[in-house]
Every structure is written in C-alpha cells, then in structure tokens.
Amino acid sequence: MALFRKFFHRKPPEGLLEISERVYVFDCCLTTDMLEDEDYRVYVSRIMSQLREQFPGASFMVFNFRDGDSRSRMESVLTEYDMTIMDYPRHYEGCPLLTMETVHHFLKSAESWLLLSQQNILLSHCELGGWPTLAFMLASLLLYRKQFSGEHRTLEMIYKQAPRELLQLMSPLNPLPSQLRFLQYISRRNVGSQWPPLDQALTLDCVNLRLIPDFDGEGGCRPIFRIYGQDPFMASDRTSKVLFSMPKRSKAVRQYKQADCELVKIDINCHILGDVVLECITLGSDLEREEMMFRVVFNTAFLRSNILTLNRGEIDVLWNTTDRFPKDFSAEVIFSEMGAGKKLASVDLPHMEEKDVLPMEAFAKVQEIFSEAEWLDPNSDVAVTVFNQITAANILQESLDSGSPRSPDSRSLLESALEKVKEKTKLMISENIVSSPDTSSPEKEKDTMSSHKSYADPNSILKKVDESRGLRVSVQRNVHSKIFSPRMVQSPVTSPLPNRSPTQGSPASISRFHSSPSSLGITSILHDHGSCKDEESTSSSPASPSISFLPTLHPLTSSQPKKASPQCPQSPTPVHSNGPPSAEAAVTSSPLPPLKPLRILSRPPPPPPPPPISSLRSTPSPSSTSNSIATQGPPPPPPPPPLQSHRSALSSSPLPPPLPPKKLLATTNPPPPPPPPLHSNSRMGAPTSSLVLKSPPVPPPPAPAPLSRSHNGNIPPVPGPPLGLKGRGILQNLKGQGQTRKANLKPYHWLKLTRAVQGSLWAEAQKSDEAATAPDFDISELEKLFSAVNLSSDSENNGGKSGRRARPKVEKVQLIELRRAYNCEIMLSKVKIPLPDLMSSVLALDESVIDVDQVDNLIKFCPTKEEAELLKGFTGNKETLGRCEQFFLELLKVPRVETKLRVFSFKIQFHSQVTDLRRGLNTIHSAANEVRGSAKLKRIMQTILSLGNALNHGTARGSAIGFRLDSLLKLTDTRSRNSKMTLMHYLCKVLAEKLPELLNFPKDLVSLEAATKIQLKYLAEEMQAISKGLEKVVQEFTASETDGQISKHFRMNLKEFLSVAEGEVRSLASLYSTVGGSADALALYFGEDPARVPFEQVVSTLQNFVRIFVRSHEENCKQVEFEKKRAQKEAENEKLKKGVYNEN
C-alpha cells in the first residue's frame, strides 16, 4: 500500500507544506515577512481555491496559534469558506510551549478529526513569531500518532522545514531542551495507566547550583529566581501567575564566585502545581540590570522523584552563553510533598544560654598563666586562608580540566597542544621514514579525520529550506548581546537578540544519550599490520597453481637442441627422469631476474614478491637484483619447460646475479630480491658469479597477464617463480604433493621488512660476497613438531584417510579489526553459555545467568555504526565468520541493544546503589542531629567562649558573643609561659575539676567520625546517576513498544522493575533533600555560612577538636598520676629521712 500511495501521491497546493499524510502547514509561517491585509487575503483565498479543486469532497479544520484574545486575520478570511477554526495560544509565559492540558486537547482533537474520515484534512497556521510553538505541536502530533519515533529526531525534522535562522530570530533562548522534555512526556503515555496523569502539588524547597557559571566576567554571578505557574491554592483559576520572585535587595541576593564555592544552595519554599516555568536571572553590580542565565519548564505530574537534576544541555539558555557554564555544571531542583510540613531547623547560638556554664570569673588565674600569649588575629585566620586557597586551586584545576572546548582559552590550549603533537609527529616521521615507510594506514587516517570532525559544532540542527519554495527570510539582528529583562521573551521578534555566529546552534545535550561503547584501552596498532595481515591471509590460503596472474621467471638454459614439448600443466605431477646428466646443465638452475627497462629506475621499488606457489624443502638465500643488465637486444623467446629434466651436477639453489655498477647503486634504491624457484630440493651451494657469466643471454620475460583491479597500473608486475627446474632431486618433492605444503605448518607471526635498510645486517646478508649459508632444516621434523593439523596414529597408518587429512582447513572470515576481535573473543570465553541464550537472558533481565561485570563488558563490545554496516553488507556464508562477528550479529538482532544492556546493568546495580546512598545519607543526617542535639557539646562551646573572653578582657578581641568554628583548633596554639600547658590542656583541667560530667561528650557524637569520610559532592553525583539512570530506563521502556515480539519479556520485566524503582527513588530523593537541609543547618548552628563553610569542613573541624580534647585530657590524667606518684615518692623519702634521723 505504501508503494501505491507513493506512486499516486499528489503534490500539495502552492503555499502549503505537507508534514504528514493529510496534515499541512501554511508556508507563510516559515518566514519573517509580514503581508499586508489585502495581500494576506489574496494569499489565503488562492490556497483555499486550490484545495477545493484538488480535494473536492474533503473537509478542513484549521489549527491557528495566535497571540492575545483578539480576532486573528486567518479567522476573518476563513469565515467565507465555512471552515472549522480552533485557536490556541502562541506561547506559555514567553516560552514556545503550551500547557500539558492544552497539548492534550490539541492531540485529541487532531487525532479525532483525522480518524473521523479519510477525507478530512488538517491545516496548521501561526501568526508571526509562533513558528517554534507550531513546530513543537506538530512534533507532538507525529509522536502521539506513532508516525515517528525519537523525540530529538522528530523535532529536528520539523525544524528543518524552515530556515535555520528562523528559530533564533523568534526565540532569544534556545527552547529545545524544554521542548524535548515535554515531548518525552508525550512519548511516555503508555508507561502509566492514565495519561496525562493528574497534577500533583509539590513544594519547591531549594535549587542547588554546582560549578558556578561566569556571568559577571569575574568567574561568578548574582542569581535570583522567579517562578511562574498555576496557584495550587486556587484550583478553579487555571491561569499562570508569578508564584515566587526573589527581591533584588534582599539579604539572600549575593555574589557567588567559582573560586569561593562549588555548590550554591538557594532556598525558595514555593508551592507549585502543574506546568511550571523556573527562571534564573543574574543581577548586575548595581542590583538593577538583569540578564537571563537559564530557564526550565517542567510539569509536576511527570516528576518521577523529588529531585530534578539538569545538566548544561538540559536548560534553556541564551544562544551565545553556553560557554559561560562549566562543562560539569548542574542544577538540582529539590521538591517535597506539599502536605508534609517541613520543620525549619532551629539555630541555637551558644551565647544565648548560660545555665551550668562556667562564668568568666572562673578563669581569673588564666590571665596570669597565659599573660604573654596572644591569640591570632581572626581577620588573618591561617586555617581559613589555607583552606580557601586549596579549594580555589582545586576548583581552578577542575575548571581547566573540564573546560568547554568551545571557550577561547581552552581552544587555544587545544590548538597549542595539537601543534606540539603535529611537530613531534613530523619529527618522528622524518627520523623513521627510512626504516618504516608504511607508518600510516587508511584506518588511522579515517580515525584522525573523524576525531577532527568531532570538534565541529554538533548542535546545529536547523538547515535552510529548499529555495524552490520561494520563501524569503529577512534576517535582521540587533547589536545587543544581552537580554536585560526576562519578560522580553513575550515579544521575541522585536526583542533585542544576542549576536551569534553561524556555527552556534542548539546545545550539545541534544545528542547526549548517544554513547559509544567504551574501549578496553587498546590504542596501539602493530607496525605494518596491513602488510602482515595480507601476508598471513595469502600464505594461509591454498594457492592456485595457475600462473595467469604472475609473470614467470625463466631459468638459464643450455645450448641443447630444442625439442617440442607440450605445455606445462597447471597442476604439477611427478615426472621420472631417465636421461643421462648433461655437462652443460650445471648452470641451468641459477635463474636471473627478468629484464626491465631503464626508465623504471626512478620509480619507487615494487612491492614485495608474493610467497611461492608451492612450499619449499630448502630455504634459498636472498639475492639482490640489478636493473642495469638490460643493455642487450631482446633474445628469442624461451622454449617451454621440458617434461624430462636432467640431473644437475651442481646445486639447484638460485645463484645471485652480478652486482650493478656503483654509480647506479648510488642513485637508485635496490628493489626487493626475486622469489625462490618453484621447485627446489637440493641444498644451497655457494653462489658464484662465474657461472652466470658462462650462461647465454637471458631471454626477456613474456608479456604479463592483465592486472586485477587492486593493482596499480603504473607499477611493474612482480616477477614470479620459475615453472620448473632441471634435476632429478626436484622430482622427489613433487611426489605426493598437493596444492600446498606450507598450509600444514603453523605460521610464524613475524613483522616482515619489505626492504633492507643500508647498513643493516639484512643489507649485508644480501651481498654476494657476504651471503651467509642458512642451516638445513628437516621439513619432516618441522611438520611433526609444528603441524597445523593434528595427525593421529590411525590416520597415519590408514592410507584411506590421508586425503581427508590433507584437506585444507576452512578459513574464518574476519571483518572486525584484529585486536578488537581478539579482545572480544577473550571476553566471550568467560561467558559459558551460547550467544543466543546469552541475548535471551539479557532481554529477560535475568541476573542469575550473567553478572554486572559481564554486562559491562558486553556494552564495551557493542558494534559501532561502521561495524554494523560492515556486517550487514556481508553477503557470504555467515558460518565462516569468526566468533566476534557472530557475536556482533546476535547483538544486531536486538533493536538498541546497547541501551538495553545499559538498562540491564542499571537494574542489577540499582538496589546496591540505593542501599549505599541511603546509608551515607543516614550517616550524615545522624551526625548533624547528634551535634545539634548534644547538650554537653553546647556547654563546652559556651565554656570556651567564657575562657576566651577572660583571656581577651580589655582588648579589642574581648566581649565576644561567639567565635568561628575553626577557632577550636587554635586552643593548642596558645601555650603558657613555661610552655608546659596549652589552652586545651587548661580547658580539660578546669572541666575535670568543675564540670566533670562534660568530659564524656564524645559519646554523644558516635556518627561524627563516619561522617568525616563522606562527601556530599559524591552523594550528589550518586543521586544524579540514579535519577538519570531511571529516566533512561523509562525512555527505553517507551521506545521498546515498537520493537515487536523480541522485546515482549523485556518490557514485562522492566515494567515490574519500574513499579518498585520509582518509589525507591522518590523516597531517596526526599531523604536527600532532608539531609541537605540538615547539613546546611549544622553550619548555621555554629554561626557559619553554609556557602563558605561546607558540611565537610564542619565535621572535620569537630572531629579534630574531639580528638585533641581526648588526647589533652589523657595527657592531663597522666600528668596528674605522675605528680601523684612523685608526691608519694617524696613522702616516702621524707619518712625514710625522718626514720634515720630518729635512729641517730
């Protein structure tokens, strides 16, 4: 039916753009030109007339997106044609979105109209500036009717229908992140039982900003928040209102810098319901000028937990301000149930209560003990200064490491680094060009090109519309680079817009879910791997004895009478020699290379010769060739090889030809040696040049056969081995020999050198006067030791099975890169179940068959796009593929297999991750409550305050109402005049004498030590990973609806998991919000600013204070015990003295 529909498809009338079947858009929506009323009426009337002619029995409905409540021009024109018009708003609080209630009404109305009759046609129109909203609504309709899949791909397809600049002209902020979020709401309509779900009232507690963006030019910003939405206390009023607006002159408005803090928490405590617009605005130094930082639009009914984590690619930002946000920036919006009243943390200041506390008069003697000691100036606090320096250095280092590649500084660093790499590469190439000429491969060049392409802007999704439509776009930009009012979005056409380069587009998070499989760290490729692979494949496969593709190398022949003989057969057969030996046959076994014209001397050396067609019993020594001997005229063609050969008096090994002249050797590179002869059995003899001089002139080689496609026509063909040699010894090797003998031996996987470098031992070995004689190898022993085929005793004794043993081994076809395929097979060797059963277990989410480590390894070896195309294009026998290729084919049978594996990995680790995170959050919560609830610690802090005021009485530091938390550690810095006691020892002494019940206060802080080992930053990352992972699970659950039967069990098991996991994550997010409040309240408890003194610093300082306090108390006890023993000893000594005195 699709083919017939395409064949009979009719073009839409001029002025309409077809989005899908029976859904059209007026092309005036895709331009910024404003038609006059009369021209507009003519334009619409012409389109309506063509529609009536093309669809005579059709009914039409028009969806119009307008601004305001006044009557639109489209409505006034279409009243003459008796058409149904439905008006919708053009935006929602300045955002090119509509509320979920309006979107649902639009989708149901459009679907009902199109299903009512096949003659019904839907027309879409928007007023000037409404194209972003219209594009979002059309994408929603396509996803709702399941005509397209994938939110980003669908929205991108719609935006491509208009010029690329149109979206930026009509929307100062990039609306794609929020639009994609709402499209995901629509795609998830089958996850729950009811869609859209009922709105839930929540309380937006706070917003946490991690890694402060730079909006003031000094590495910081001054953020304030505004919230728009429906009032949850007025259910009858559905209009949006300003629910929260932070006053510009309030104490909560302050400047935050990246060097001071990584996390900023801003309390809001605003009740929300339904569709919510959250705006973050930064104020100028005058607290009047406003600039939009980011905007987030969401719906409370679709929040699956009480935390909404957004990274840099999931917020609406100005088109030219993406680089102001750090790469790892994130905004955490924390919610709580509206009905659950949140108890505010009470802050008890130490100076407010003086019951059971030592007064300042109790430390009257402390001024005498520490009269010459002074406390450090609190303004020059060393501990705080050092900590701030360390924190600033760490933040700066992280900012540099995670900087955006699009920022000018990071771009310059990258360019300089690339230049250094290029210079080093050039230097290495120039040094190694002689020894390793083939250091690059097409695969590496392709990888390099792809890596450079990745630096291009991946965010441009809007392309220019086809010029044949006659659309004219008037691109007018203002010079303003900033938006000073967040409400200016309501009139985007006339708003001042930021300048933006053509390469900047939507944020990078549009493709953030596409992840490639992580590698195993294999970054090195063997040198000359391509040639090595070719050699192995050539030598391992049985070579055909046909000589049609190889020119032959003819041996020197004697002056015997020529005798007609039949042509040599393609398959050599044993021939017995009965003739007597000939004296002239002594030189018949020393072949010379074929003659080549002198003009080839300037060309590069030819490629290495192929391996011999048959396996050799002897190992001939390499001989150098010369191109300078081609000086005589062409001799007569050689005779065909005779059937009968004569015994050779000398060795049958090839003799090296005479060396070329020195002048020629100095100007040309020596070509590779010729291959060994085809059949040779005798041992090598000493090569001599006199035998070559006695031989007749060498006949020219015959014309080579046509080259294959892979050969270069400019490079001369490589000479091949001779067809036969005279001598009786060679005939013994031909007996019982099949196609090839070398295939029965295991290969030696060396890295072959294609040319000998001058001065190396290989070049010296090729000289005739220094040629080394290779030892004789027993081939039968080699076959017995290194045979590639297992030879059993039965097969050796049974001659009938010899042919079966000699059958060549079936070669496996390798399509995947060798090293990756090898590593993949190692990974598969640890999986003890067949591949089909493995994938069935993955789709069933069966954790008993495969563990998380194996799932992660499967993710690493998911086929890439190039590998998938390579496997899909393979048309041969799939049984001949290697195990890695077979594994990849099994993976390709499952749609989005990598995403499903990641979902499986998340499911396996979910419960352990939730348990660990909950344990850490409970530890922090317990530690904060224990510190704030310890009455003994509070009395000790007040005692320290009295001690400090006693010491600083009469000075500027006196009469303090409190002290900084890090001052606790300075109690050990102030020593007495005799340096035998510190303030900490004195404090313990006084408490032991007057308030001994406070000495065991560390027992109240049992969770403090465990809390010092936990960082809120890591807990936040874990919480974000769990929330994001659950979102990916929901997305895959939605996308798997169209997979068919293969994902049936996957969806069923995943739905059960989601029913449990969503409740767990919601509870965990609520605990996370509570713990965050407790951590901030702990800093406030000691009068500190949570933004400057984080929770980690508070608990670390308290733990150090407890440890020093306990140690000082123990030292005091030891000192008291020592003094007591010394007093007893002195008393005994006195008694002894008195006794002696009395005796005298």
Curated annotation (Swiss-Prot):
Source domain of life: Eukaryota
Composition bias, Low complexity: 538-548, 614-629, 644-653, 679-695
Entry-linked PROSITE patterns: C2_TENSIN, FH2, PPASE_TENSIN
Domain FH2: 735-1135
Biased composition (Pro residues): 603-613, 633-643, 669-678, 696-705
Domain C2 tensin-type residue range list: 199-338
Listed InterPro entries: C2_domain_sf, FH2_Formin, FH2_Formin_sf, Formin_homology_domain, Prot-tyrosine_phosphatase-like, Tensin_C2-dom
Catalytic center residues: 126
Region (Disordered): 429-463, 482-729
Positions with biased composition (Polar residues): 491-522, 555-580
Presence of keyword Iron: no
Domain Phosphatase tensin-type: start-end pairs: 17-193
Compositional bias annotation for Basic and acidic residues: 441-450, 526-536
Keywords, in A-Z order: Hydrolase, Protein phosphatase
Any Pfam family: FH2
Family: Belongs to the formin-like family. Class-II subfamily.
Name used for this protein in its record: Formin-like protein 18
Protein species of origin: Arabidopsis thaliana (Mouse-ear cress)
